[in-house]
Amino acid sequence: MERSGGNGGGGGGGGGGGGGYGGSGGGGGGAGVPSEGAAKGLSLLLAKSAEAASGRASQSTPRSAGMDGFLKSDERQRLAKERREEREKCLAAREQQILEKQKRAKLQYEKQIEERWRKLEEQRQREDQKRAAVEEKRKQKLREEEERLEAMMRRSLERTQQLELKKKCSWAGSPGPGGRDGESENTPPLPLTLATSTPPLDTGTTTAAAESTNACDKLSTSTMNLPKQTESPMSKHLSSSTVAISYSPDRALGSPLKSSYKSSPTRTTEKKKNTPISAMGDAGKGAMAGGEPSQMEKMKKGRVATSAASGGHGSPLRRCEPPEDISKRLSSPVKSKITSKTYPQSPKTAKPTYLGSPVKYYFPPIANEETPKKKAEKEKRNKEKEGAPGQQSTVLPREESLEKRMADKYATEKYVADKHATEKHSAPGGKAEHSAGKPTAGTTDAGEAAKILAEKRRQARLQKEQEEQERLEKEERERLEKEELKRKAEEERLRIEMAYKREQEKKRQEEEEKRKAEEKAKEKAEEELLSKEKQEKEKQEQEKKEKAMIEKQKEAAEAKAQDAAKQMRLEREQIMLQIEQERLERKKRIDEIMKRTRKSDASLEVKKEDPKVELQPPPDVENKANKAKPVVPNKIEINVLNTCQKVSGSERAAPETFPQDIFSTGLKPVGGPVHLDVLDGKSNSLDDSTEDVQSMDVSPVSKEELISIPEFSPVSEMIPGMSLDQNGTGNARALQDILDFTGPPAFPKKSSENLSLDDCNKNLIEGFNSPGQETTLNTFC
């Protein structure tokens, strides 16, 4: 565009004369000022000649138009290319966005799954830590309970030893009943420190106490390590037999009547042998007092056997004890209950002198002795609770229930001890004197008492441990059930989540497949549509070609048909002209014949002098004949074509001569069809001719006269100067020639009687226009 402007306006203006193009894109100072560039262009144009300007304009106009068109097509192509590139970029950017969105969604989903698994793992770790903390707390609690029970056992053993020492001192100081009672009443209980620091007086007592202590320790350690299978049969019997023992007042009262003069195991066996004999020989005792020693001996034997079996050491006599006593004791728990109930009321264990003394012997309860340790334990527990409140939430109800049970237990023991103390205080003095009078009847040593106490404590500990074990097992089962339920719920949730994930993935895949199938179907439909359109176009083109070919063929056929029809029409016209000429010739000959006939008739009548008939025709008929002679118009319509023919008198006088082979019966055969309008025209012309002929006045002739017509010959007629007389023929011969020429008549002959004046001419005309002649004409045409 700039180049065309430069060509139009010159090089100095920078394209200023290019119709305003130089103003917008010119190189000089005319950018943005189109008027200056136009003025420069006009000044340069005025400097040149008009011829050069006109020639240049005439040369530059088509060049600029061609360049503009070329540049416009290039611009359109460039714009179309830019649009295509822009569309492709948009599609690529959209696909990239879709891919990024899918990638982000996938990353988000994976992140959510990882976060969920991480949370589940953290929750599992927290549960494991919580379970470990609970287990550690339970073990610590069991250790503390074990230490507390051991401390209780040690304190009870120290108290028992203190009582035994006090008893020995009282028995050694006053051998009589009075002195012993007084000492026992006035002697206060020794403190724990004194009991522990005072050396024992008898070596047998110390050894028995040591053995009992070791046995208790071994029993405690062995029962802690016993499995559940070994504890179940024995613990069931012990639990029923030690319910009353654990809450009996023997724990608070101890066993004050223990013999301290036992020095060897042989002495113990002798005492065991003599005790039933002395009990059976004593008749002053009641049934209850007599039955108690035997029951006590049985219990002692059973307990010694169990302690020896669990401890694994002891005297040979204890090892050799038969197992029948153990089975009896385990199978009959009622005996232990009876002994526990009757043991405080026996004369051997009851000491009314202590209760009746002004300085009463007061046994401090176990709860009061354990208060400092319990306080320390409570403070420690409170600190642990404050330090780990989340971990102790599950253990707190257990500790509270355990402390509550222990407090109830201590309160019950205190109440039972007070009750027995009041009963002993209100008991009659005779029974006390009776018991005091027999110092050797129910005496036992310190070892037996320690063993009995250790057995009771062991049974209580076993029962407690069994209950604790059952409770822990129950809690463990509940915890496992809860964990199992939680695990199942978590598995179910994960299964549902995975199923949902699979369902979503399946749904997404189905949607993707459906979308792809739809795209494929759409592409296939488009391809089918394009193929259909292509086929339709091809079909239309083929139809157009076929139509064009058919049209061409039709036109060619029509042209051929028109040529053939034209040729046939020309032939028919020629034939009709020939027929018309022949008809006119025949008519002419008939007229000549008629004239000659009239002349002959007139001559005959003149000869006969018969003035009836005038031979001269009327003047109007002659005028008509004369008028018809010079010009004969023949108008024939064949397929909308009019043909006029003028026939002069000279031409009629010298008609055309046709070859011999044209007319076999006077006509030329033609193979083409003849239309009806031709025949109508012919019939009309014939009617006109008949009218002309009928208008003539012909004199009536008879049959004989017609027969006597002289002979007529066309050859003789052609020769001028010949007459009927010279020919030597009559009228009959002429009529015969006419009939031979025109053919036989196709109608019945009429008689002469029925003929009128005009019948002769009419007969001739009808003979000429007979149906046979028409058929011959139709066959010719």
Swiss-Prot record:
One GO CC annotation: midbody
Region (Disordered): 1-37, 50-87, 120-567, 597-628
Chief location bin: cytoplasm
Tissue: Expressed predominantly in the glomerular layer of the olfactory bulb and Sertoli cells of the testis.
Domain of life where this protein originates: Eukaryota
GO biological process, one term: axon development
Coiled-coil region list: 73-168
Basic and acidic residues composition-biased segments: 71-87, 120-158, 318-328, 370-387, 397-436, 453-567, 597-613
GO molecular function: kinesin binding; microtubule binding
Biased composition (Low complexity): 192-210
Compartmental location: Cytoplasm, Cytoskeleton, Microtubule organizing center, Centrosome; Midbody; Cytoplasm, Cytoskeleton; Cell projection, Neuron projection
Compositionally skewed regions (Polar residues) per UniProt: 211-245, 257-267, 329-348
Compositionally biased residues, Gly residues: 1-32
Keyword entries, A-Z: Cell projection, Coiled coil, Cytoplasm, Cytoskeleton
Function comment: Microtubule-stabilizing protein involved in the control of cell motility and neurite outgrowth. Acts as a critical cofactor for kinesin transport; in the proximal axon regulates kinesin-1 family members, KIF5A, KIF5B and KIF5C recruitment to microtubules and contributes to kinesin-1-mediated transport in the axons.
Oligomeric and partner information: Interacts (via N-terminus) with microtubules; facilitates microtubule stabilization. Interacts with kinesin-1 family members, KIF5A, KIF5B and KIF5C.
Family: Belongs to the MAP7 family.
Name of the protein in question: MAP7 domain-containing protein 2
